[in-house]
A protein has these predicted regions:
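A common structural junction motif
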Residues: 73-80
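The canonical Cys-X-X-Cys-His
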Residues: 31-41, 109
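C-terminal capping alpha-helices of c-type cytochrome domains
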Residues: 86-117
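Extracytoplasmic/secreted proteins, especially bacterial periplasmic and envelope-associated proteins
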Residues: 25, 29, 54, 63, ...
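Sec-dependent signal peptide recognition
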Residues: 2-9
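Electrostatic cytochrome c docking/interface patches
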Residues: 13-29
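Inter-heme linker and motif-flanking segments adjacent to c-type heme-binding CXXCH motifs
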Residues: 41-44, 115-117
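Gly/Gly-Pro-rich "capping" loops immediately C-terminal to redox-active cysteine motifs
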Residues: 42-73
Length: 117
């Protein structure tokens, strides 16, 4: 794990205690950005990319919520997801529309995903 990501993960771990997350914002983030590759549920149950795990499958994994918390550093996400203060892993242009997430966005997304569980 790159040092900047280790520091960022520590910051993310601290954020849930700071305040309530926004489930509706998490849902909006998932539907806007994640649904282009992942099946989220009834929202796009016939969508996604065939080789990409659905949110339901990810939730069922032993480390599923950790995968959501660290998705921005897991392939292929670093190519198009940016985090403030963390340099991208590559200078190559993103192959999907890039977007930025914050620790609050991650908490919102996880709150939404917990509602799906």
């Amino acid at each position: 794990m790159k040092p900047a990501y280790a520091i960022l993960l520590g910051l993310f771990a601290a954020f849930p205690a700071l305040g309530a997350s926004d489930v509706k914002n998490g849902q909006k983030l998932a539907e806007t950005h994640c649904a282009r590759c992942h099946v989220i549920g009834d929202f796009n149950k016939f969508g996604g990319i065939g080789s990409t795990p659905s949110f339901g499958l990810l939730i069922g994994m032993a480390d599923g919520f950790e995968r959501f918390r660290t998705f921005f550093e897991r392939r292929p996400h670093p190519a198009f997801v940016s985090v403030p203060g963390v340099p991208r892993w590559t200078d190559l242009p993103p192959y999907a529309k890039p977007f930025e997430v914050t620790p609050e966005n991650i908490d919102d997304l996880i709150s939404f995903v917990r509602k799906l569980d």
